């Protein structure tokens, strides 16, 4: 009886193991955004009140200067190549310039007024791809 149960379990396990398709893409969370870096582009980012978000720059970059049009409604914490951001007030829109040891980044940042947690355009992580 024990062998029969073990046999059924193994058949079920093997069948399910082969049903996984390694060529199907993994689901991507829309709140993690990757932008193609272009020095002539302004990147638009929307943040949720009370949530921490991160802007990640290239691995060989370090933040040197951050300038905000209206700094009051934002909490910023730079750490090496990452900039941690938190919106403090709803419905605020301003610009931000980040200068690293390699590049200049221009942003238009906005704090969300919606209470919908599933808003697609909210950014939790912003990363950059650098074409050669």
Label the predicted regions:
Residues 18-132:
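A general "mature secreted/periplasmic domain" signal
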